[in-house]
Amino acid sequence: MIKYVLISALLVVAVYSFTIEDNEDALLEEAEDELDTEEERRMALPPGAVCNGHKSDCQCFGAKYKCSCPLLWRFRRSAKCHCKKGWAWTAIKKRSCHNRYQWSG
């Protein structure tokens, strides 16, 4: 019985430690995103330009343009993402972009 209690306690501690690490990683990503928003505010990429697939669609100029990447682009070095026209929901998603003043009329 005591073995089960100890094993359960160790399992809870292990899960808790992984959760704390995930929270720290999330905080670091949020800090990096805040720095990236300053760059996004300054410049939006024109349609057809090469964009960073790891960042948001806000980097592409226009309400309906998104950063579109080819299939399995993360595993191919030569694959590049480009700003391409998306669907109507892309415009809805991009309403929260910090640089929307550049393309909104």
Swiss-Prot record:
Propeptide positions: 18-41
GO MF term list: potassium channel regulator activity; toxin activity
Location(s), subcellular: Secreted
Keyword match Signal: yes
Principal place of residence: secreted
Cellular component, GO, one term: extracellular region
Tissues in which the protein is found: Expressed by the venom gland.
InterPro entries linked: Toxin_34
Signal sequence bounds: 1-17
Annotated keywords: Disulfide bond, Ion channel impairing toxin, Neurotoxin, Potassium channel impairing toxin, Secreted, Signal, Toxin, Voltage-gated potassium channel impairing toxin
Function text: Insecticidal to house crickets. It induces an excitatory slow-onset impact that leads to irreversible spastic paralysis. It also modifies human voltage-gated potassium channel Kv1.5/KCNA5. Most likely, it binds to the voltage-sensing domain of the channel, suggesting it does not block the pore but prevents its opening at physiological membrane potentials. The recombinant peptide binds to the channel in an irreversible manner and slows down the hKv1.5 current activation kinetics. It is not toxic to mice, when intracranially injected (at 0.5 ug/g mouse).
UniProt record similarity statement: Belongs to the neurotoxin 04 (omega-agtx) family. 01 (type I omega-agtx) subfamily.
Name under which the protein is recorded: U2-lycotoxin-Ls1a
Natural source organism: Lycosa singoriensis
Organism lineage string: Eukaryota, Metazoa, Ecdysozoa, Arthropoda, Chelicerata
